[in-house]
């Protein structure tokens, strides 16, 4: 029995392109669809567009996580193995599945529906959390290479996308600890400014361009704007400033040079634009444990102070900028999430 994407029994989270109500496009990490159902049959219809790396969907079925390899390009029907439970056999149980985007815009995947057994039922889910956070970040916020747990505190191993998992990003872990929904506007390699960072080489695209978009990777076509009325977070985390040292670490070389002054001005402008969309939200500015020069954090602190907005804060982790030369692995992301969620819980937030 086909369950179409527009079914009211399904729950979604994330910035999703709903141009076609029965073909929603997942772009950002942590974007998800959830379903509760009966029976022991589960398949998912998808359409994938690949830019780079191998692409996988995350799947958590009855608390057990797996990953599903997506076709490089085109439609696919993915079968998910369901273990019948004693409760299910007795006729009063159910299964719950969460499908989610593990990776950033290295691909875009269209969700085309579920398939369950004939005569089976899709059940109501509990209400979504009333707490809502939003994250603007880079590969660390996306959970890139997070599953390479043999490389804690070390440079990355060779990889082709298989270790990237947004579930284990500090961003989603923080949302879990807070009991909050999340929109994770994160892209590997992205910096603040166009023309810097690593994303979309050699015509680098920065967060100053991508922050208000659904589609922003030119590989997939023209950019499209996000409708900010669709989601109003009470907390926004801005985690930009670690890819900005490429191709030149001008902040480290000369804190007061014209490039550095320009960066601080534009960082402040981004915060003002976010504030314009969310007048009542708390905005928490961070970098991460990934090694970087402290001058970037000094700049963020300076901007936050100059804005004189009580609800814009700069938070610094215990091992900020000195934790690891590689991407954050699961234990390091957990460390960040523990510190960040504890800090957020102490703010006077009207959830």
Regions found by a protein language model. Name each.
Residues 30, 156-256, 290-297, 331:
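Conserved SGNH/GDSL esterase-like catalytic core that processes O-acyl groups on lipids
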Residues 282-351:
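Extracellular serine-dependent O-acyl
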Residues 124-126, 223-232, 272-277, 349-351:
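Surface-exposed acidic, glycine-flexible loop patches that form ligand/cofactor-binding
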Residues 170-181, 270-282, 306-309:
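A structural motif corresponding to the C-terminal end of an alpha-helix
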Residues 267-271, 300-301:
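Generic structural signal for well-ordered alpha-helices
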Residues 1-166, 348-351:
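N-terminal secretory targeting modules
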Residues 132-136, 141, 182-186, 234-239, ...:
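Structural recognition of the beta-strand scaffold that forms the well-ordered cores
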């Amino acid at each position: 029995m086909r369950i179409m994407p527009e079914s009211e029994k399904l729950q979604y989270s994330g910035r999703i392109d709903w141009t076609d109500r029965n073909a929603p496009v997942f772009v950002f990490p942590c974007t998800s669809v959830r379903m509760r159902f009966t029976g022991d049959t589960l398949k998912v219809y998808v359409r994938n567009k690949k830019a780079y790396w191998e692409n996988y969907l995350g799947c958590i079925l009855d608390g057990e996580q797996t990953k599903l390899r997506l076709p490089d390009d085109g439609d696919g029907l993915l079968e998910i193995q369901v273990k019948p439970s004693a409760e299910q056999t007795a006729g009063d149980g159910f299964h719950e599945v969460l499908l989610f985007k593990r990776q950033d815009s290295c691909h875009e995947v269209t969700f085309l529906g579920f398939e369950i057994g004939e005569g089976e039922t899709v059940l109501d889910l509990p209400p979504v959390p009333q707490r809502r956070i939003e994250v603007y970040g880079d590969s660390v916020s996306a959970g890139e290479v997070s599953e390479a747990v043999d490389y804690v505190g070390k440079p990355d191993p060779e990889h082709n996308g298989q270790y990237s998992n947004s579930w284990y990003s500090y961003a989603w872990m923080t949302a879990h600890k807070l009991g909050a929904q999340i929109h994770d506007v994160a892209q590997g390699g992205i910096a603040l400014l166009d023309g810097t960072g690593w994303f979309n080489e050699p015509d680098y695209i920065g967060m100053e361009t991508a922050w208000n978009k659904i589609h922003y990777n030119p590989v997939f076509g023209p950019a499209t704007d996000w409708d900010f009325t669709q989601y109003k977070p009470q907390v926004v985390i801005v985690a930009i400033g670690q890819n900005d040292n490429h191709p030149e670490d001008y902040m480290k070389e000369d804190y007061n040079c014209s490039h550095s002054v320009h960066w601080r001005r534009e960082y402040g402008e981004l915060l003002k634009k976010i504030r314009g969309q969310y007048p009542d939200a708390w905005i928490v500015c961070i970098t991460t444990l990934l090694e970087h020069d402290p001058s970037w954090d000094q700049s963020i602190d300076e901007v936050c102070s100059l804005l004189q907005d009580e609800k814009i804060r700069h938070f610094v982790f215990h091992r900020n900028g000195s934790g690891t030369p590689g991407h954050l692995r699961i234990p390091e992301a957990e460390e960040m999430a523990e510190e960040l969620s504890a800090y957020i819980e102490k703010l006077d937030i009207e959830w």
